Structure formats: structure tokens, C-alpha cells
Regions:
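A cross-family phosphate/adenosyl-ligand binding-site feature
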Residues: 1-127, 135-195
Length: 195
């Protein structure tokens, strides 16, 4: 399976890192593109340094992909993900900022993440948007509805608590397992009614 992962400036970097691990474990081919704000959030939430240089941040992030991922610059309009003729099975934006969601809902594009999501929608391919922000304004809700009606799946980065998590990593894994389910990828996470 070939998956595009866009990382934007919303909080939720641990979800992106764990998703990379899950995709790599499933032998997926992964293209990663992080926005400028996404790099800052990755640096802050994963590595404790919002000023970590872009290249170092991405190199450290890719350690989670175990060699299965390739990085693309947000300004790379010639990347395969910018074309509907490229064979890509699924597109995920995790985390997805409300600014990115609004851009997608309007059909505008200013970087590779926006373009890749637009390609997914126009080609009828799987697109999963993972917002985290709360509370939500009426504009946020309308943008989510617009994106969903255009074909995107909205998967909020909100863990359940019924599985008895003992730590934050288990809460992250809960959400990532739901995300992998959306992509049709098998995982080891327990399901409802399992122990």
C-alpha cells in the first residue's frame, strides 16, 4: 500500500510518529510532507525543541518509519502526490490544522499537502483528515462537513478511555489503531470486547 502523510501545524505530533510506525510495520510505501508549522510542532512535541532545524526534525521523525518513508518539501509541486495519474492508495493529514481543513474545504491550494488532498478528492481516493483542535467554531464545523461531503473521512484525534489505558502512549495507540482501520491495515490493538 502507498500512503501520503501530510503533517500540519496542529498539536498531535505523537499521532503522526506512531502512524509512521504502524504504516512501516505494514510494509507500506510512505511519502511524508510537513508544513513549516508542522515542523515546529514536531520539534516541540516529539523532541522538546521548537527551533530544531527542519532537516534534523524530519530525520528524527523518519526514524519512526524504519526506512519506509521519503520526505517531500511542501513547495514540491512536481512530486508524484501532486498528480492524479500517480498510483497512491490513501492520503492522511495527521494532525490536520483547522487552517488546512479550511483550505481544503474551499478548494484552494498553496502547498503539496493541499494539492495531494485535492488529488485524493478529485480521484475518489481515500483521504483521512485528523483534526485535534477544540472547541470548534461554526466555521470549523462547516469546513469539516464540506470536506466530508466531498469524500474525506474526518477522524478526530480523540482517544477513548474504555480500553483501560495506563499511559499516554496507549491513548495515542488507540487513535492510531482507528486510523489504520480506516486505511484497511491490520494491527495488534485490542478491539471492543477483547482483552
Amino acid at each position: 500500500m502507498h500512503v501520503f502523510l501530510g503533517i500540519t501545524g496542529a498539536s498531535g505530533a505523537p499521532y503522526a510518529a506512531r502512524l509512521l510506525e504502524g504504516l512501516a510495520a505494514a510494509d507500506c510505501e510512505i511519502g511524508v510532507c510537513a508544513s513549516t508549522a508542522g515542523i515546529e510542532v514536531l520539534g516541540t512535541e516529539l523532541f522538546g525543541d521548537p527551533n530544531l532545524p527542519r532537516d534534523e526534525t524530519l530525520a528524527r521523525l523518519l526514524e519512526h518509519a524504519n526506512g519506509a518513508a521519503q520526505v517531500y518539501d511542501p513547495s514540491d509541486w512536481g512530486a508524484r502526490y501532486a498528480s492524479g495519474s500517480a498510483k497512491v492508495d490513501a492520503y492522511v493529514i495527521c494532525p490536520c490544522s483547522m487552517g488546512t481543513l479550511g483550505t481544503l474545504a474551499s478548494g484552494a491550494m498553496s502547498n503539496l499537502i493541499h494539492r495531494a488532498a485535492s488529488v485524493a478528492l478529485k480521484e475518489g481516493r481515500k483521504l483521512v483528515l485528523c483534526p485535534r483542535e477544540t472547541p470548534l467554531s461554526r466555521i470549523h464545523l462547516r469546513n469539516m462537513l464540506e470536506a466530508q461531503e466531498a469524500g474525506a473521512t474526518i477522524l478526530f484525534l480523540a482517544p477513548g478511555f474504555y480500553h483501560g489505558a495506563d499511559n499516554v502512549d496507549q491513548l495515542v495507540d488507540f487513535v492510531v489503531s482507528r486510523l489504520l482501520d480506516q486505511l484497511g491495515i491490520e494491527h495488534e490493538a485490542a478491539r471492543w470486547g477483547q482483552t
